[in-house]
Amino acid sequence: MGKRAFGALFLAILVTAPAWAEQPRSPFPPIEVSDLAGQTYPLRNLLGAATVLNFWATWCGPCRVELPELQKLSNELGGKGLVVLAVDVDLPPISEEGVAQQLEFIRPRIQTFLSRTGITLPVYLIDGKTQAVLGVDRIPFSVLLDGEGGVVRIYPGYSPESTRDLRQQVLGVLAERPKQGGK
């Protein structure tokens, strides 16, 4: 790309950025999540001023690296409105027996993982059908939501760079809070 073309592109982005920034964000689909006791909650009831949904599994190597970093982020910014939800995707599509019987198998693995790693993030579960509907086709898979449940950014996979970017995006969403009337 030539210097003029690059300059024109940069100028176009600069001029349109304020208009783009004011566009409403796409809402995250209305889903329900289950806690480790089998209680079901609408996701919208769990949102903070900024919410990170981290889809993970106990057997996922990159998840084992990313979750402690998200725990640190939660420890740092939780008092400022950040909520980090660890959403385990070990459940297969819910069968007729429902979540309760499947939880009996999965719960001990999750609890062992949490105790070994010191992770204290709230853990919720979704089943394989919900995972497919959401398009979570790899893990870890993180989604940053604003206080209204709008999708700010999606992070498929893990890298140190994506974690740094996530932190910056979270700070940006938290800084927007007064403009949104606070939450």
Annotate each PLM feature.
Residues 55-72:
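Conserved redox-active cysteine motifs that mediate thiol-disulfide chemistry
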Residues 1-7:
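Bacterial N-terminal signal peptides that target proteins for export
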Residues 7-17:
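Bacterial N-terminal signal peptides
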Residues 19-44:
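N-terminal "domain-start" segment that seeds a small globular fold
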Residues 52-53, 84, 142:
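Hydrophobic beta-strand anchors of alpha/beta hydrolase catalytic cores
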Residues 141-183:
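Thiol-/selenol-based redox modules, centered on thioredoxin-like
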Residues 102-141:
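Short, internal strand/loop/helix patches
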Residues 92-104:
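Short, flexible/disordered intra-domain loops and linkers
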